[in-house]
């Protein structure tokens, strides 16, 4: 807080650029990484109103060592504070820079010299309030720099990073142009992971109904894209190794396009292990893949374990790997037994077919409800810790919305491809309109389902932050059910799970 309003001059590497899609520069921002400290501010000379372009890093930093960046500051007091913070965060420390309205975004991957006003992130002062400082602390971000002005920039920049940055921006603009502001912003969140600018009502509606996970790039997205692409390449008779290589490369690029969040990294690692197991003709093991993903994420940065995305993503997969088998085992034999015997209809071929179809539908419905319940059981403590509320109806709602994602996501990606080709081939206008109509219909369906669910009695349970005693008791019960659950009859397992 003591640094608030201090004017700093920083140099570092530009990453994660964000530009508003309305064409203005309001809230345009980027992260500045590879920071280091230089206490002597006398070496900084501001050379004019416009940014100078230099050939190499040493000309920007004023240092002979091109591998080191300098932070030129206005007071020794600020220097000691930054030094102390950087020692805590390590060499990966960064700053979030918000540009002045008349400034253009620098190229991603370039090194720049900037100056602006320090704005520390706010800490939570009330229970339940979002802790901005803790959120950015886990991202190794020291502070925000407001009214940022760029005074120098290297000619060299990251070609792939800049391409992905421009592709992300153009894709957001295209979604809003084709689908309108509200649906376009929702589509950008689902496909690109860009929630900035999303309609606040829609965002609150999804969260209240318990389907906000659709707005996070996770295993659902990567599995649909990766598995779909891998299967398609095999169907066109490409070699399995080549199909896996192409799928891997496209998934890695897509993960970078969407920001490479924690849930995305977890899903990417697990999918790559799944592909590797197939190539080696081994059976993929879900718990092993999950453990490898956790190690790769936590070893370089242990504080990630406190991140909400990490906890929710991994707890969901734990539910799939551990709780779903416990709940589903044995229920295949229950649905067929729930049949009505009738002397008139028994033995009639048509009725037997209908009864068999009903039995299959019951088994399918039971398995999916139990799958949703199993995932919810492991995620529930973290949902209450981070959001202080839970929607019991979300278990049933997800039975409808998740299968629709298998249609929605390919339509959204297809719209990006078709809309770009329509300028060259006008015959694609009809497919483009059909894709837009299908997407808008699914979004409308989502919205109506959410409104219906939130209108039901007990749609949202406001629990507040759970006590450690409640969390401990719940965890012990969950472990006991996971360990000894298969020894119980299916009806008792379900009763224990609900309790």
Range-by-range predicted roles:
Residues 159-161, 165, 191-196, 258-264, ...:
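Hydrophobic alpha-helical transmembrane segments
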Residues 160-173, 327-330, 334, 344-365, ...:
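Short helical patches
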Residues 326, 373-380, 407-414, 445, ...:
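Transmembrane alpha-helical segments that form the membrane-embedded catalytic/substrate-channel core
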Residues 12, 116, 190, 218, ...:
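Divalent metal-coordination and catalytic microenvironments
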Residues 152-162, 208, 384-400, 412-474:
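Membrane-interface amphipathic/re-entrant loop segments adjacent to transmembrane helices
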Residues 1-213:
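Membrane-interface helix/helix-cap signal primarily in integral membrane proteins
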Residues 3-7, 353, 357-377, 396-399, ...:
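Functional transmembrane helices that form membrane-embedded active or gating regions
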Residues 199-394, 463-499:
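Hydrophobic alpha-helical transmembrane segments in multi-pass membrane proteins
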């Amino acid at each position: 807080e003591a640094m608030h309003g201090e004017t700093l001059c920083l140099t570092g590497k530009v990453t994660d650029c964000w530009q508003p899609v309305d064409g203005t520069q309001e809230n345009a921002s980027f992260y500045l990484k590879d920071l280091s400290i230089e206490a002597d501010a006398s070496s900084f000379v501001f050379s004019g109103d416009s940014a100078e372009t230099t050939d190499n890093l040493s000309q920007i930093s004023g240092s002979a060592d091109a591998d080191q960046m300098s932070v030129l500051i206005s007071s020794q007091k600020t220097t000691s504070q930054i030094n102390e913070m950087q020692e805590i965060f390590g060499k990966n420390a960064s700053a979030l820079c918000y540009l002045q309205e008349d400034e253009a975004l620098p190229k991603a991957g370039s090194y720049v010299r900037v100056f602006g006003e320090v704005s520390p992130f706010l800490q939570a002062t009330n229970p339940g309030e979002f802790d901005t400082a803790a959120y950015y602390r886990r991202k190794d971000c020291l502070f925000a720099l407001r009214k940022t002005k760029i005074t120098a920039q290297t000619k060299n920049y990251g070609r792939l990073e800049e391409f992905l940055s421009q592709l992300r921006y153009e894709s957001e603009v295209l979604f809003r142009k084709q689908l309108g502001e509200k649906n376009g912003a929702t589509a950008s969140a689902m496909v690109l992971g860009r929630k900035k600018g999303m309609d606040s009502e829609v965002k609150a509606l999804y969260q209240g109904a318990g389907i906000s996970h659709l707005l996070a790039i996770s295993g659902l997205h990567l599995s649909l894209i990766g598995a779909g692409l891998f299967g398609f390449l095999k169907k066109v008779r490409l070699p399995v190794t080549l199909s896996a290589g192409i799928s891997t490369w496209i998934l890695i690029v897509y993960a970078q396009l969407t920001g490479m969040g924690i849930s995305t990294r977890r899903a990417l690692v697990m999918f790559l292990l799944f592909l590797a197991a197939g190539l080696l003709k081994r059976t993929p093991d879900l718990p092993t893949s999950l453990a490898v993903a956790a190690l790769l994420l936590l070893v370089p940065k242990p504080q990630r374990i406190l991140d909400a995305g990490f906890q929710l993503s991994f707890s969901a997969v734990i539910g799939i790997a551990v709780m779903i088998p416990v709940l589903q085992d044995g229920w295949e034999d229950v649905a067929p037994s729930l049949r009505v015997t009738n002397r008139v209809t028994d033995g009639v071929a048509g009725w037997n077919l209908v009864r068999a179809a009903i039995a299959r539908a019951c088994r399918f419905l039971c398995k999916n409800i139990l799958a949703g319940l199993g995932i919810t059981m492991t995620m529930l403590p973290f949902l209450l810790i981070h959001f202080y509320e839970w929607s019991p109806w979300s278990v049933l709602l997800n039975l409808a919305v998740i299968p629709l994602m298998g249609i929605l996501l390919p339509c959204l990606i297809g719209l990006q491809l078709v809309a770009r080709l329509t300028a060259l081939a006008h015959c694609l206008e009809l497919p483009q309109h059909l894709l837009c109509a299908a997407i808008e219909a699914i979004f409308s369906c989502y919205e109506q389902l959410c409104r219906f669910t939130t209108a039901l009695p007990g749609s949202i349970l406001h629990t507040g932050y759970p006590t450690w005693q409640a969390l401990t008791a719940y965890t012990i019960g969950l472990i006991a059910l996971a360990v000894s659950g298969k020894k119980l009859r299916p009806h008792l397992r379900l009763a224990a799970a609900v309790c």
